[in-house]
Amino acid sequence: MHPDGCFDWNDQAAMRACVDQVGFAHIFVPTLDTPMVVHAPLVIAGDAFHFHVARRNRARPFLDGARVLASVVAGDAYVSPDWYDRRTDQVPTWDYVAVEIEGTARLLDEAALLAQIDRLSDVHEATLDPKPRWTRGKVSASSIKGMLAAIEAYEIGDVTMRGTRKLSQNKSAADRAGVASHIASPLLAQMIRAL
């Protein structure tokens, strides 16, 4: 995470809410030859985090039992020094909000995979209201069986979470106001204004 302590984010509940809202991670997996990255939906399951991958994913053979690092980015955007109140001797930067989840990956059974699919659907279909929500009941049993044959579910347990909220906290209130009024990400602008 960012080495400057003013950007540390230690609110575990807020980080979990962020992960739940984003619902997608880049999961870094060590191998003997080279690190690999799994791009996967992520859901909270108690103190752990669940994800699934295609059985054909080249990182899959290395997942079970591996110490992995999942990176969840809630937003990021370029910051121009022209937006600061004090423009002299300023350089461009990047603001972002990110959560790292470090833990041990463990293969889950089919029941956990089905529960994960249902949870993912429940969370993300709710954001699409007023459309009728998709549920697994809308798909034939044979289609579900085929899908299950193509993917595997994993849990990241024994978790350590770290967060960074780099939202121009190291700048003056006037500089932050300038960034918030110009930054391309409405979410980051809202977070900067809330500081």
Predicted regions mapped to residue ranges:
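Short, structured beta-strand-loop surface elements
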Residues: 55-119
